[in-house]
């Protein structure tokens, strides 16, 4: 084979390789462009509509004070309502609230009747194919509640040998049973049929400490007699929900939540509505 023939063959082999690889490169380029457009919001029609129309539509079940309810004047009020209003203010748009029964919230969201759900929502792992969830803005996990004079109780290990009140069958009851079974915690479990009953037991000195969720704790702890031990023993985040085709919208929500955590806005809401 002559030198020219060899060079011609090498060029031919290179061209074959190029034609084999070029389609793959084009496919990868198109996929990357698609991701970029998605990330830049070109495919988030919800965020685009909010910006163009100047209206954020928020769905909530307005029957859960102090997070959301309708007052005597017919106005939406509460912790979550303030979140929705602050989002709208941050984005320079108006906010319209819709009162929807809790069981119908996700249907309304998927039917595009609302843009976001802000309604003391727990993170539901079974819905993540259709729903995008924000970062947590409130932890409703289980907490210890103690009389002020029991300040030595600072963690769950400190209830060893103590009388602990829980609501019968509630998550706190299950948590305490698990701790006694798996970690060998020794405590006398006293049950009540409702939250008011176990708080009465604590206030009357019949138990040393109680465990309940953080929302219930704030509802019943008033004045100086009782104290909530922070941080919570478990994590039960409240989150904001958007449709799966609204990635830019939920990203903007997450940025707002991060800013609120840094500025103390969420602490202010807890102080206003819960404490």
Where are these regions (language model features)?
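Acidic, polar ligand-binding/catalytic clefts
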Residues: 37-40, 81, 85, 89, ...
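Short, Asp-centered acidic motifs that coordinate Mg2+ and/or phosphate
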Residues: 56-57, 111, 115-116, 132, ...
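Extracytoplasmic small-molecule ligand-binding "clamshell" domains
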Residues: 10-20, 38-120, 189-191, 253
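Ligand-binding clefts/hinges and TM-proximal coupling segments of bilobed small-molecule sensing domains
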Residues: 28-42, 171-192, 224-232, 257-275
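Periplasmic-binding protein-like
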Residues: 138-147, 214-258, 274-275
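Bilobed "Venus flytrap"/periplasmic-binding protein-like clamshell domains
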Residues: 57-66, 74-89, 121-122, 143-197, ...
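Hydrophobic membrane-insertion alpha-helices, especially the h-region
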Residues: 16-34
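Solvent-exposed, polar/charged alpha-helical surfaces in well-ordered, non-transmembrane soluble domains
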Residues: 48, 81, 85-89, 103, ...
